Amino acid sequence: MLGDGNEGISTIPGFNQIQFEGFCRFIDQGLTEELYKFPKIEDTDQEIEFQLFVETYQLVEPLIKERDAVYESLTYSSELYVSAGLIWKNSRDMQEQTIFIGNIPLMNSLGTSIVNGIYRIVINQILQSPGIYYRSELDHNGISVYTGTIISDWGGRSELEIDRKARIWARVSRKQKISILVLSSAMGLNLREILENVCYPEIFLSFLNDKERKKIGSKENSILEFYQQFACVGGDPVFSESLCKELQKKFFQQRCELGRIGRRNMNRKLNLDIPQNNTFLLPRDILAAADHLIGLKFGMGALDDMNHLKNKRIRSVADLLQDQFGLALVRLENVVRGTICGAIRHKLIPTPQNLVTSPPLTTTYESFFGLHPLSQVLDRTNPLTQIVHGRKLSYLGPGGLTGRTASFRIRDIHPSHYGRICPIDTSEGINVGLIGSLSIHARIGHWGSLESPFYEISERSTGVRMLYLSPGSDEYYMVAAGNSLALNRDIQEEQVVPARYRQEFLTIAWEQVHLRSIFPFQYFSIGASLIPFIEHNDANRALMSSNMQRQAVPLSRSEKCIVGTGLERQAALDSGALAIAEREGRIVYTNTHKILLAGNGDILSIPLVIYQRSNKNTCMHQKFRVPRGKCIKKGQILADGAATVGGELALGKNVLVAYMPWEGYNSEDAVLISERLVYEDIYTSFHIRKYEIHTHVTSQGPEKVTNEIPHLEAHLLRNLDKKGIVMLGSWVETGDILVGKLTPQVVKESSYAPEDRLLRAILGIQVSTSKETCLKLPIGGRGRVIDVRWIQKRGGSSYNPETIRVYISQKREIKVGDKVAGRHGNKGIISKILPRQDMPYLQDGRSVDMVFNPLGVPSRMNVGQIFECSLGLAGSLLDRHYRIAPFDERYEQEASRKLVFSELYEASKQTANPWVFEPEYPGKSRIFDGRTGNPFEQPVIIGKPYILKLIHQVDDKIHGRSSGHYALVTQQPLRGRAKQGGQRVGEMEVWALEGFGVAHILQEMLTYKSDHIRARQEVLGTTIIGGTIPNPEDAPESFRLLVRELRSLALELNHFLVSEKNFQINRKEA
């Protein structure tokens, strides 16, 4: 609950509310709408009729729990049952049965679905709203050409344009256009009806010559002319029913279906009163659009801003799931139709249950969640990541834009985004501006528009009324900006406030304001709202910060921030990381796995998450925080989750930081840290990796899991139990066997060695005919085995593969190469870990934990980190935590600076440490070099900011290769750690080696270690016998490839070898 001094209290909406409400809307309305569209199906003789009775559909509660669905790689779904009837028309008999249509994946309260054991989330999409839009462009002569674009509900486009002679054309394809009279006539109007329904009939008559009269002489002629231009068909086509059907399918269905949103937009734009249930484009719409186009030509009316949010619509999870359900019903209709015809043909008596099968619906949803671009794997790096992922908005996807073709204007911030789409939080790279994030208070309205709340300012009533306004509505009001929140109404003189009106920012008197913002964070997303002093940062750095907070790794010992914004608790609550009491009661038992809550005469068991792996290999873990015997209330926090402390989000640590150079170790965003962070586990995190192996039934027999693996050392098998699976609690190293498995194979008699055949003949010893296919621990996977699961797919078939999963936990301290970041876009890589005694230390003897480069602040203009740094120091000394809303300058000038200095001054007085606040250089202090004990020349800013450890860790990136695969074409090592790739020396690396004059190393890089096939084969042999490695005599493979590519361009390139002794030229073919 958040309030302000001038009004009542407002509640922040649930951060997962948009996703969950969308799914509920699909279940309540979307299912019924699509089921009502399901037609009655008759056989070819029209003797049997099949139909669904929509009023009695039901969804069954799943038999498994969410956690089991994840572990067993199943889909957490509900079975859909509908009543269906089969009617025999001759006897009027009807057979009614409840049939199973298929499974619909369910969504939990966090807005996620579990499909095949994977958490997935559906992203909301921004599309151009269907309707008509007018714009003006300059032709090659510099004359304005006005066009009106009609966008259908399917995304199809048709254009009306008016030329210099005021003639109106309809562009039916990129190259062809027809007269508006021909189009209207083809849609069913005659000339008299056209002239009666337009405002400017004389303009329509002005370009009506004899040729045009002939084209619109009859409906058939108009349709033929329209078809000829649309299909680019020459000759004289003949009017027929098939021609009309083709035109209906290819043009009218794709480009003329407006939908309910398009019909509403069309009526409002053209002042029409066509009923909302008439969702197709009518001749009346075409003529009204032409009238509006004529008005624009003569200076009446206004052009449309295509990037305004009033011209966009949100394609929510409800719309996407409803579309897929409709597609599944179309497939089901085809199946039922074919089954009825087959049953009649074979003289079988069908029943509703025999006609309907579940695969169409089940497979449609599985393919949607698995393949659709807007269905993504939920990012579960930390609790904040899970919330933010569900609130993304994407311009990409089917029917939307692409990263290559989107213009700068579309990516840019628009005034209509105010309070609806965050101006800060977007992705970096090619998709910048195309993937945004919802503002905190934004919601999706009934017509698919984004709505934002405002307080209405009225002189007639003293109460506060909150309005949710769509993007087009708030332009007619004077909306006061953020700093109007602190007005003192007792002062009678006129007060001037900044306000927004018709996409412009003005300064007006308070009496003229109609609406005002309800909350300082109203414009920002969750990620941007967690940045303290965000108003002092450059927007680019705030963008990086909101993205990097999502990459923070949950630490083993979390700590909440000293300086925050107040939204940390709400973010933790809505993330699902906390265990919350569902009712009142008393704690009767607690352990690491569950909490027992007694109340209302029964006992409720609340399970806790124990060392659960996320899909980013981070550790999800809950720790109970209520003692046994304590009485609790409903909604109280029972257990903290990963990266939460006391019910608040805790992604990092408050560490002592100095901004100063130190021997060049923190240049170019490098960071110098103290070994205290390593030894005291300040930035230690746990990571859980999953390794799995499948057992199949092959043609030679089933694969066998065993601990008796021939030809392997006993040391590698030391951790296996009797079944051949690694034991819980074992410490495993690289190369150890996690699961022993043998695969049977056929071995011919001739392939045995002579001694094997002798043993078989004399002693009857059977030599192993199985191949070892064990699960081995890869490089970098060392750790402790914390869980082993042996899973068999449900169904009972012997051909279902069994899956064995081994979970290994790794403890990772911070080390050189890891990435750390603050909350202001100040990121860096650990360059050196210094002993504590060598780190700079304060006047009270405490050594600094981190040293940042001060040059990273002025050029990047993220000064908020300095305010946070100094206020964090004061808070640590005073044992206080601060929660500061942004834009505090709305209360007084330099409010942030005054707050920080006053807290530092108070900390200096209470701790009797005058160095905490020195008036000559406030916020700075003289510190000492730990190596010499001498003070540094200049005072240094010291403080306690909140620093995060990011998931970009050196253990996941560092890689070495001794042998591996080569690319087929270039014969060079593959690229990347995942493919066991090797070094790839580019031209800049060659320049660097040339600069040092290392000729032999350079030759090795370009030949033996790269793509010289014969030379690298000779290296192995000469190394084994201890000989000298011969110099390669011919060109490497990449040079030969270049020669061949030049030959394909008819260019011949030859190279020669010149002898050092007699300078003879020896020509070698490439």
Curated annotation (Swiss-Prot):
NCBIfam families xrefs: PRK00405.1
Keywords for this protein: Chloroplast, DNA-directed RNA polymerase, Nucleotidyltransferase, Plastid, Transcription, Transferase
Single GO biological process annotation from the record: DNA-templated transcription
GO terms for cellular component: chloroplast; DNA-directed RNA polymerase complex; mitochondrion
SUPFAM superfamilies per record: beta and beta-prime subunits of DNA dependent RNA-polymerase
Subcellular compartments: Plastid, Chloroplast
Similarity field: Belongs to the RNA polymerase beta chain family.
PROSITE patterns for the chain: RNA_POL_BETA
The protein's enzyme class: transferase
Pfam families named among the record's database cross-references: RNA_pol_Rpb2_2, RNA_pol_Rpb2_3, RNA_pol_Rpb2_6, RNA_pol_Rpb2_7
Gene: rpoB
Name of the protein: DNA-directed RNA polymerase subunit beta
Keyword Signal: no
UniProt-listed CDD domains: RNA_pol_B_RPB2
